[in-house]
């Protein structure tokens, strides 16, 4: 009898592993993804192929990295997900001539109707938050330079002018796509009329992260975010940036690699769960690479895998609760919590019981394996992108061994218990002639935007504007 039960358990385990095996990517797969990513990056940089390239490689007009001599008070805004942050950044000389960057900030959550209403509603809400923040800090009377971290695909015409190409990450505010975002912000501030601001720079969160980390480590020339979405930027040789005139020096390029796969480059790796997540998203067929990696989708992928295991009678006695059948019910933070479980399964039990389930010990272990499969694939898929960027940089600089630092931010990278380790190990396997240091950015987006503003202000002063 016991033998039968043990045999049944073993068979069940085998079937579960068979289903989860689809998530495993071999090194050859990752090399394939990496070389396709590099090809698309190349197409994005070239004038004649830029238009149809899935990876847009957008020039940011951030050319110089800050030198540590810009001082003053800056306001910084950060819009990139469901939370919006306003930050006051004091940039100055610390003790012993050291550089100091001090910050105060406040988070505001963005109501659904502002995310999906009109651009005017969204930017009016943003200027209301700024007004509230300035009141709290008695700063209404000051006209501060403002740096705006805006984490969506933007075609820059200058450091303070950029056209929104398309919304991502669940935003849908009408009347913003195709328009200058800085202009929309300036208009909203003017409409409000109770404070003045000088918007000097708009940057992507990857750029802000890179600049922020550059202060810690002067070899930081790549910025990456793995949070709600996933994206990276890096310093590219100007001669390769065909969309901007001039061949001297380097410019930071925002890859917008989340859109990789839009032209079918990932089709052979997409599973039924990926297709279901994509079909029920606000932007079907777009941002496919990001949908494999980003925190906005990870929990939902796990939920769909769990439902598949229930259907196959391998989990929860073949019965799913109403909650488990509800889209979005398995949150991405649950994935981190399940994988952080110490082994007594208490954390896993708690999460599953809030979803109306009464799991056995074996069920808990299967749920953990499902989470590990989805998050490990995300880490490996992400590593192929970064390895593509770093190998490209090494080749274009003709260095035998390249030392480089990558500044990273984002909730998945920072909060998931094993993402980092799996990701680092995989990147290093794919970049044999590179010595890579990873550093986490602290308050990266806000601080980085303020530092970019500081550079912009300094340049404006030098140009006598």
From Swiss-Prot:
Disulfide bonds: none
InterPro entries per record: ATPase_NBD, Hexokinase, Hexokinase_BS, Hexokinase_C, Hexokinase_N
Any single GO BP term: glucose metabolic process
GO molecular function, one term: ATP binding
Activity modulation notes: Subject to allosteric regulation. Low glucose and high fructose-6-phosphate triggers association with the inhibitor GCKR followed by sequestration in the nucleus.
Annotated residues for binding of substrate: 151-152, 168-169, 204-205, 231, 256, 290
GO cellular component terms given for this protein: cytosol; mitochondrion; nucleus
Phenotype caused by lack of the gene: Embryonic lethality caused by the absence of hexokinase activity. Conditional deletion in pancreatic beta-cells causes severe diabetes shortly after birth leading to lethality within a week. Deficient islets show defective insulin secretion in response to glucose. Conditional deletion in liver leads to mild hyperglycemia; however, mice display pronounced defects in both glycogen synthesis and glucose turnover rates during a hyperglycemic clamp.
Alphabetical list of Gene3D superfamilies matching this protein: 3.30.420.40, 3.40.367.20
Chief location: cytoplasm
SUPFAM superfamilies per UniProt: Actin-like ATPase domain
Enzyme nomenclature, EC number: 2.7.1.1
Keywords: Allosteric enzyme, ATP-binding, Cytoplasm, Glycolysis, Kinase, Mitochondrion, Nucleotide-binding, Nucleus, Transferase
Residues involved in ATP binding: 78-83, 228, 295-296, 332-336, 411-415
Region (Hexokinase small subdomain): 67-203
Pathway: Carbohydrate metabolism; hexose metabolism; Carbohydrate degradation; glycolysis; D-glyceraldehyde 3-phosphate and glycerone phosphate from D-glucose: step 1/4
PROSITE patterns membership: HEXOKINASE_1 (PS00378), HEXOKINASE_2 (PS51748)
Catalytic activity reported: a D-hexose + ATP = a D-hexose 6-phosphate + ADP + H(+); D-fructose + ATP = D-fructose 6-phosphate + ADP + H(+); D-glucose + ATP = D-glucose 6-phosphate + ADP + H(+); D-mannose + ATP = D-mannose 6-phosphate + ADP + H(+)
Inducers of expression: Up-regulated by endocannabinoid anandamide/AEA.
Subcellular location(s) per record: Cytoplasm; Nucleus; Mitochondrion
The family this protein is said to belong to: Belongs to the hexokinase family.
Function: Catalyzes the phosphorylation of hexose, such as D-glucose, D-fructose and D-mannose, to hexose 6-phosphate (D-glucose 6-phosphate, D-fructose 6-phosphate and D-mannose 6-phosphate, respectively). Compared to other hexokinases, has a weak affinity for D-glucose, and is effective only when glucose is abundant. Mainly expressed in pancreatic beta cells and the liver and constitutes a rate-limiting step in glucose metabolism in these tissues.
Oligomer status and interactors: Monomer. Interacts with MIDN; the interaction occurs preferentially at low glucose levels and results in inhibition of hexokinase activity. Interacts with GCKR; leading to sequestration in the nucleus.
Record's protein name: Hexokinase-4
Species this protein is from: Mus musculus
Lineage: Eukaryota, Metazoa, Chordata, Craniata, Vertebrata
């Amino acid at each position: 009898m016991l033998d039968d039960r043990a045999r049944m358990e073993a068979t069940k385990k085998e079937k579960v592993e068979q289903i989860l095996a689809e998530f495993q990517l071999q090194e050859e797969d990752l090399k394939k993804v990496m070389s396709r990513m590099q090809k698309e990056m190349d197409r994005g940089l070239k004038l004649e192929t830029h238009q149809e390239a899935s990876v847009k490689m957008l020039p940011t007009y951030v050319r110089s990295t800050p030198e540590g001599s810009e001082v003053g008070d800056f306001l910084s805004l950060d819009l990139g997900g469901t939370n919006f942050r306003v930050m006051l950044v004091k940039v100055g000389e610390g003790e012993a001539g050291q550089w100091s960057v001090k910050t105060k900030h406040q988070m505001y959550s963005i109501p659904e109707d502002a995310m999906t209403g009109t651009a005017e509603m969204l930017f009016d809400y943003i200027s209301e938050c700024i007004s509230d923040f300035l009141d709290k800090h008695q700063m209404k009377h000051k006209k501060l330079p403002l740096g705006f971290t805006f984490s969506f695909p933007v075609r820059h015409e200058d450091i303070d002018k950029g056209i929104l190409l398309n919304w991502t990450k669940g935003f849908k505010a009408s009347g913003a796509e195709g328009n200058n975002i800085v202009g929309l912000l300036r208009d909203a501030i003017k409409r409000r009329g109770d404070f003045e601001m000088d918007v000097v720079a708009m940057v992507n969160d990857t750029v802000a992260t890179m600049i922020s980390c550059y202060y810690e480590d002067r070899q930081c020339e790549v910025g990456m975010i793995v949070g709600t979405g996933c994206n990276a930027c890096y310093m590219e040789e100007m001669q390769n940036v065909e969309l901007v005139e001039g061949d001297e020096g380097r410019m930071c390029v925002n890859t917008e690699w989340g859109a990789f796969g839009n032209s079918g480059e990932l089709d052979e790796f997409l599973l039924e769960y990926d297709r279901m997540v994509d079909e029920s998203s606000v932007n079907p067929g777009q941002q496919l690479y990001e949908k494999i990696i980003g925190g906005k989708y990870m929990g939902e992928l796990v939920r769909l895998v769990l439902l598949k295991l229930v259907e196959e009678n391998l989990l929860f006695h073949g019965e799913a609760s109403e909650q488990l059948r509800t889209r979005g019910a398995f949150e991405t933070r649950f994935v981190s919590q399940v994988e952080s479980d110490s082994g007594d399964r208490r954390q896993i039990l708690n999460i599953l019981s809030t979803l109306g389930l009464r799991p056995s010990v074996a069920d808990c272990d299967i749920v953990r394996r499902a989470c590990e499969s989805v998050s490990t694939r995300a880490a490996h898929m992400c590593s192929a992108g970064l390895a593509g960027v770093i190998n490209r940089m090494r080749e274009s600089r003709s260095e035998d061994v390249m030392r480089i630092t990558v500044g990273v931010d984002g909730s998945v990278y920072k909060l998931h218990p094993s993402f980092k380790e799996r990701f680092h190990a995989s990147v290093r396997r794919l970049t044999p002639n590179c010595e890579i240091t990873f550093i986490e950015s602290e308050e990266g987006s806000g601080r980085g935007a303020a530092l970019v503003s500081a550079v912009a202000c300094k340049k404006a002063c030098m140009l006598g504007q």
